[in-house]
């Protein structure tokens, strides 16, 4: 694999922490998100727009119980996406998850957290691609607008944040462009 996965043990630790919250959690295994009907049937309660709901339905495989599926399939997890119904839980959950070793926590939306194995970042992906294509770091450029783009904006020869992006992205970028 290109980047490390979160081990099965660590994935179960993450999911067992997250299940204590009013949250929709989707681990990714073999490039597909895994979800359960109680999440899919109530996506609006987790703040997902109609467009996001369509994307989720198209990219998730349904199982009766996500955690039981992860336990039984015994495969490492590529990523865990979490959508929270109560926004005040986001930073509380982030703090609780920060005790899990070997993971990085980021966010791409106002109501989500994304858990990846340490080292599985957009910045590392950009540098891998540049090396694969024979391009120097200085000759790379990246655009971003959110927390999950920070490593990429910092890694790129030129990092450009969107004018309507989050402050954390703007601070990581070399330049800020129009919206």
Please place each PLM-identified region on the residue numbering.
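Acidic, Mg2+-coordinating phosphoryl-transfer loop and its flanking beta/alpha structural elements
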Residues: 126, 136-178
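Generic structural "secondary-structure junction" signal
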Residues: 5, 72, 115-117, 164, ...
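Short, small-residue-biased leader/transition segments that mark boundaries at the very start
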Residues: 1-8
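Conserved acidic, metal-coordinating active-site core of Asp-based
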Residues: 13-17, 21-143
């Amino acid at each position: 694999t290109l980047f490390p996965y979160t081990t099965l043990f660590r994935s179960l630790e993450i999911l067992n922490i997250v299940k204590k919250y009013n949250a929709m959690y989707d681990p990714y295994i073999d490039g597909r998100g895994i979800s359960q009907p109680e999440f899919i049937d109530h996506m609006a309660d987790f703040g997902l727009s109609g467009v996001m709901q369509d994307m989720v339905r198209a990219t998730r495989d349904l199982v009766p119980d996500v955690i039981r599926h992860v336990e039984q399939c015994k495969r490492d997890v590529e990523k865990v996406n979490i959508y929270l119904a109560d926004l005040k839980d986001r930073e509380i959950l982030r703090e609780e998850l920060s005790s899990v070793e070997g993971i990085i926590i980021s966010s791409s939306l106002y109501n989500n957290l994304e858990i990846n194995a340490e080292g599985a970042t957009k910045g590392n992906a950009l540098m891998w691609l540049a090396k694969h294509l024979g391009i120097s770091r200085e000759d790379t450029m990246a655009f971003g607008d959110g927390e999950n783009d920070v490593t990429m904006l910092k890694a790129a020869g030129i990092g450009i944040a969107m004018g309507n992006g989050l402050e954390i992205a703007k601070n990581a970028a070399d330049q800020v462009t129009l919206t």
